[in-house]
Amino acid sequence: MTLPFSWITNDVSQCIDLTQDEHICSLSPVTDTEENMSAFKKSLFGKYDCSLNSEDQCLIVENGSSNFVTSKEAQKEAMKADSDICPPQQMAFNLFNETVVQKDMLNKEKFSHSASSNISNKDDAQYGIVTPVTEIPKQFRTVFKEFPYFNYIQSKALEHLLYSDRNFVLCAPTGSGKTVIFELAIIRLLMQVPMPWTNVKIVYMAPIKALCGQRYDDWKAKFGPVGLNCKELTGDTEMDDLFEIQHAHIIMTTPEKWDSMTRKWKDNTLVQLVRLFLIDEVHILKEENRGATLEVVVSRMKTIYSLSHLSEDRKAFIPMRFVAVSATIPNVEDIADWLSDENSPGVCMKMDESSRPVKLRKVVLGFPCSTKQSEFKFDLTLNYKIANIIQTYSDGRPTLVFCSTRKGVQQAASILTKDAKFVMSIEHKQRLQKCANSIKDSKLRDVLQYGVGYHHAGVDISDRKVIENSFLIGDLPVLFTTSTLAMGVNLPAHLVIVKSTMHYVSGMFQEYSETDILQMIGRAGRPQFDSTATAVIMTRLSTKEKYVHMLDGADTIESSLHKHLVEHLNAEIALHTITDVKVALEWIRSTFLYIRALKNPAYYGFSEGLDKIGIEAKLQELCLKNLNDLSSLGLIKMDEEINFKPTETGKLMALYYIAFNTAKLFHTIRGTETLAELVSLISSCSEFSDVQLRANERRVLNTLNKDKNRVTIRYPMEGKIKTKEMKVNCLIQAHLGCILVQDFSLTQDISKIFRHGTRLAKCLSEFLALQENKFSAFLNALILTKCFKSKLWENSSHISKQLEKIGVTLANAMVNAGLTTFKKIEDTNARELELIVNRHPPFGNQIKESVAHLPKYEIKFQQLAKYRATTAEVVLTVLLTNFKQLQKKRTAPDSHFVMLVIGDDDNQAIFKQKIMDSSLFKTGSWTRKIEIKRASKSTNVCLNLISSEYVGLDIQQSFNICYLGSDSFNADLVTQHKSENIFSQEIYKTSTKTKDIADTNWSMRQTAIKCATRECNHNCKNKDACGHECCKVGVSEKAEMKTNFYSYLNDLRTRNSVSSATPVKRLKMQMEAETRNVNLQNFVFTPKPSIRSPCLKIPENILLQAESSVLTNKYKASHQEETCCKYEIKGCGEKQTKGMPKKTCERRNLTDSDKCNSSSSENAAYVTFDLGNDIWDDFDDDNLLDASNISSLTDQHTSEFTDVSFSKNQPVSKSSLSAGHHEEARYNAMSINKDSYRYLNAKSEVFSQENTQCIDVVPSNQKLHGKMFSENTIKHMFTLQEETNYPVTSKMDSPHNGCWSSNIFFKTPENKTQERGCYHQEDETNAFIGIFNGIF
């Protein structure tokens, strides 16, 4: 018996009943060969129109030809592919003509265009026919490779999805395989469009990002081999990456993101390419925020489709199709009516719980709760009842418990471990112990050993992965989690418990939404393991009936668009979708609000009993009220005929997706707000309403706000953190100040805050740019926008954090090393950078290269010689100094630009210009002539060049404009150029009060003062009008004393620049506070008075004469110290005349601090820890041991050093060797004989002290040649020794004579054996061992 269809002529919808008689079917594998592919099945893949002629036959139209097929013939054709499948007793294929349905609908007075299929027969659902995967074309079967047959719900929907293009809505319980419904619709579209499918796009929309991410991973693996590209477009996606969507076939997005994007794509053809729109969890229409957004987005897509298909070729045109799935709801027909249009009525299919693959048992438990008991205490009492519920309903299988808060998750897990144990065996315990050893969280590790775990967003990612894997494989019997897991991670369980139906949102407790409840209980049932599952909801006795009603699917879905109509009306007006009241009403008719207002007007505040005309009048009145609100803020313009035009402000609000309350907040700006006030204003925006202030976060936030022992935020707030606005403000400042926040939940909040904050700050800056009299606030808004994008304050020292591969840790290391500007980083040696950040080469070269390829700007400001009393003409020039270097490589993105802003003391924005880097790459400059009007307060103008993304590239200059009759007509222009880290103080703030004006002028003067100047100490009342030049330009500051470490780094750079290899030895410098002010005078050697030797008989008068001669020569030498020149061993070339001694003073190897100290102690011994550049080149340690073999030096260069008399064993100082010319006169003036031997000893002592301060440096690339001694000198010295028979040991050999300069190396003789015979045995005991100057 063939089941007839019937038209239901009520004013709800038309229903097509496709329920079938009970039948049993056996399944066997099916092969899809060419022979088995019947003509009937082939006809289903083409476009067709069908009309029902009689009960027993239907008309099939294919390619213009018609064939009549009886129901029995159709049945045979359908089952011809597999003879093993038992057909039903009677089966009818009812294919309906869409035009006939349309005519019938127009003839009847009703508001519905949809057809509904009610499938509720339990026996039919259990034993009905299921379709094999081979029903679809072979090239797409890999999408369903995980199963050979579609389930009953999928099989029933396949006929409408695969063989027609009508809009489709499925209402089925959770866990019934609704994802396959979308995949069948995708395959239908691919069958219609030839490869490579470049002109079609598919949009999948889900309420949350977690579902989009799951679907992206799933479909990328399934449809990737077929040839489709998938792209995820959510709130985490950067706006600069949207060009990738142009090459994507399937786009996963959320309603909010798609709404924001389509507001920008009015003229873009990308939206017009969308041919399939998939809506998951469509029952979120009842949610207040997401529901309104989803409703507007679908209505907008319908409008775009209706406008675009008019210009398309009707033969090749593919209509836009909507496919939506929903949980069990009673009024799913209303959704189908909403998605339908006059030409394509939608199909609605309803499935009951009996068709669920895993049967779900739903239990609602009510617990008593007094009115005095808080929600926190009630939630705590439920923790002690969980053990009994698990024991009753779990059957020893995995259990998932949902809690409202993170703290509640941990508390419930801890209590359960005390009440029950879930370890089954020793092996089970060992596996749990192994998992616990890999857990970082100590509390989680403790409970995991008892078979209980917890999972929420605050848990470390690695710990979450371990917990998820343990639960999936069955090692973890009980898992506690928050409700966010129900939306994000797919962890099915046999038993699901919802502990309390209240959760803490926006500072108050609220009931879970129906979507949240359905998602949580939808986790019950594992198709691969279970045939049944259980869901338990724990709630109050007072709300028990509510959730029983909800689980039965009796809650009607209502629209929430009327609560947010004002923002969406503004968006549609900005897109020119709505131009007048008549068009606005037409747009309202395309919404779900209109469908439900006709059926339930009382819910929307309309009177009962209104007809269609009355309801439309009420909707028109609602539109006019919201349009007046938009007009009052200047977001739209309305004329007398009630035509609408968007304003620039209204376009900004629509473009940046700004709430209406936020727009009202922006209109309260006075124009003199500081940076701190703008941060506070943005923190109060409605976009942060979902940020929660948790009790366990207050301590961390208060520490960030005020703490004496730690780094705090830049602008501390008064009192403690008590509101969510204060929390947002604190987190913004902490992140901009590079203050580490270790709390994971706060880190997630920061990510959300900066995502919204960047958008809000950009909108605020463009909003203030439209107003000429708010220069100060506009400039601070530009700076704040850059701060949000770079995540740094505008005066931050952590500018290196903006470079690639440098995070907070490495940026802190560079700040500690003094690298706080891009210029300092660029001037630092690459190897030194690697030492600072502890990285291997070529990391330093990469950092320097990145900085070198950043844009470098300069500004030139020239006033033309056309002086007037009220106006002045100036020429502005912006130079890109390294534009040739940037032709090859650029660090900044192509979208980088600078904003040129000029303002005066009247807070007027004189000039604004956006300059793209791409325009500067051509010629390297940008020039513009502008006219400046004279301000009433002063003639100063402030010029600012603000980078769009980088901190450290901004330029600020202040100019004094000359006008006729001005006091400063002939004054010099005061300029300031800052190439890094400008704006150390706030942009000046103006006010009407005299005191505020004075503060403004002071701030402007601060801008004019250069970096190396300070404000003078004059107490002038008006420093702009006084006669002191220092009041306007400042007073130069003294240069700071450079530290020992700075000198050490400079010396390290110098040595590194000339050294080809790393030094073999290094002398570590001791960084102590005391070493900076060491008085080297304390280390001067004071010789003891000479004692006459009994062996020498020298007359007293000779000694007195000798001592007097020494003092005389010492005085002459000190008198000419100021005019002495510096000599190198290579030679100065000039000889002293008239026997006047000349003292050499070489200080090239001294550090800055040593130079300062040495100047104060002229006669003190100089001690340095600096090895110098000359120490390491051509140096041989082995040859130093033969320092006594100096005879080989006596035969060379005898002409330059003549008549210099030394004791043979007397150590020769470096100064005496290198400055031989002027010391020669001193020694030739003395006659050395037998009686003056002691005189020579005394003179040597004084001489060694005298020449300690004056040393020469041996160049690192030269070897010291032995040209120190003349033959006469050596001969005279040996003769003197033989005549006196005095021991060769001299007093200068004493180790106490450390004042001798020893910064010299002796060249080892080439033939040591030959030279060694020229020495006495005593010579070997007097070896010169000194190596480093000043050490011994």
Curated annotation (Swiss-Prot):
Residues 388-589 form the Helicase C-terminal domain. A motif (DEAH box) lies at residues 280-283. Keywords: ATP-binding, Helicase, Hydrolase, Isomerase, Meiosis, Metal-binding, Nucleotide-binding, Zinc, Zinc-finger. Residues 646-961 form the SEC63 domain. It comes from the Eukaryota. InterPro entries: DEAD/DEAH_box_helicase_dom, Helicase_ATP-bd, Helicase_C-like, Meiotic_Crossover_Helicase, P-loop_NTPase, Sec63-dom, WH-like_DNA-bd_sf, WH_DNA-bd_sf. GO terms for biological process: meiotic cell cycle. Its cofactor is Zn(2+). Transmembrane segments: none annotated. A zinc finger (C4-type) spans 1016-1031. Might have a zinc-finger. CDD domains: DEXHc_HFM1, SF2_C_Ski2. ATP binds at A172, P173, T174, G175, S176, G177, K178, T179. The keyword Magnesium does not apply. It catalyses: Couples ATP hydrolysis with the unwinding of duplex DNA by translocating in the 3'-5' direction; ATP + H2O = ADP + phosphate + H(+). One of its GO terms (molecular function) is helicase activity. Residues 159-347 form the Helicase ATP-binding domain. Its EC number is 5.6.2.4. Required for crossover formation and complete synapsis of homologous chromosomes during meiosis. Belongs to the helicase family. SKI2 subfamily. This is Probable ATP-dependent DNA helicase HFM1. It comes from Xenopus tropicalis.
